[in-house]
């Protein structure tokens, strides 16, 4: 997909394939072993807690990423009931196994305690509005949120851009992919969602600095959204103006606008159709 960076953020509270994997490995595990607390989105885990190694997906991704020159951002998705609580990505985590707490707010605090940046995922998913429920009021009020997803899959939340501006959050666009990107995007003629991060390089340190400085834009289905000045800077860096001919009788010019980027721009005059 032409990516430089990939964030690995498996669900903490929802791990639907654990039971199937245990069945597949029944000769290697004690008879009667069952998945434990593998769906605790709407209820708390019991005293046994989470048995899985939540750091393993990051480890596996890093091993494969070396073959492709990809940088892996370690993370996890804190996944609670979507309307009252919502979903949150913890990025740059150091130990995903220490994130979970029965109190969702404490889970976010646990992420911040290990230096993670927390992104509010798909804030309009399954909701009728982007108004803050009580949990979000507390989470934002404590300064636990660093970024917000304004595009997720085929969904776009324009009002989240205003929130990002007001609360000084970085913006992002993500696939939230649970299948192959070729199936979901490429075979339908689309490029995958992605976040454009204006970093000095693709090291974890440079990426984190860019996110903290909010130098990001969101791309989805041919649309780029985010901070107006960053959008202007991207366009002027991509498109050049070249005068091809000047009519000496009236001064009219014929110009070309070569686009040096891989982004397709559509030009419109105010109130008119595309040029």
Which residues does each PLM region occupy?
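Short glycine-enriched loops at secondary-structure junctions
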Residues: 76-80, 124-127, 177-178
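Charged catalytic cores and adjacent phosphate/nucleic-acid-binding surfaces used
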Residues: 2, 85-93, 127-275
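Generic beta-sheet signal
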Residues: 116-118, 171
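A metal-dependent hydrolase metal-coordination microenvironment
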Residues: 1-114, 121, 143, 150-151, ...
């Amino acid at each position: 997909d032409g990516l430089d960076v990939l964030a690995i953020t498996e669900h903490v509270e929802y791990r639907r394939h654990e039971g199937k994997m245990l069945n597949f490995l029944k000769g290697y595990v004690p008879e009667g072993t069952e998945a434990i607390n593998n769906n605790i989105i709407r209820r708390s885990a019991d005293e046994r807690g989470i048995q899985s190694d939540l750091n393993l997906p990051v480890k596996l991704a890093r091993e494969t990423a070396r073959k492709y020159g990809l940088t892996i951002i370690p993370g996890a998705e804190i996944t609670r009931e979507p309307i009252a609580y919502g979903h949150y990505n913890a990025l740059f985590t150091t130990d995903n196994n220490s994130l979970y707490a029965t109190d969702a707010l404490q889970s976010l605090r646990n992420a911040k305690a290990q230096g993670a940046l927390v992104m509010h995922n798909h804030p309009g998913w399954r909701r009728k509005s982007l108004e803050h429920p009580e949990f979000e009021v507390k989470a934002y009020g404590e300064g636990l949120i660093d970024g917000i997803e304004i595009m997720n899959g085929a969904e776009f939340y324009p009002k989240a851009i205003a929130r990002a501006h007001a609360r000084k959050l970085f913006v992002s666009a993500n696939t939230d992919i649970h299948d192959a990107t070729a199936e979901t995007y490429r075979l339908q003629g689309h490029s995958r969602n992605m976040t454009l991060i204006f970093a000095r390089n693709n090291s974890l340190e440079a990426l984190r600095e860019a996110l903290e400085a909010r130098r990001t834009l969101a791309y989805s289905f041919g649309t780029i959204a985010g901070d107006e000045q960053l959008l202007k800077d991207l366009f002027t860096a991509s498109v050049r103006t070249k005068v091809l001919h000047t009519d000496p009788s009236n001064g009219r010019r014929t110009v070309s606008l070569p686009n040096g980027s891989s982004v397709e721009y559509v030009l419109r005059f105010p109130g008119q159709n595309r040029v």
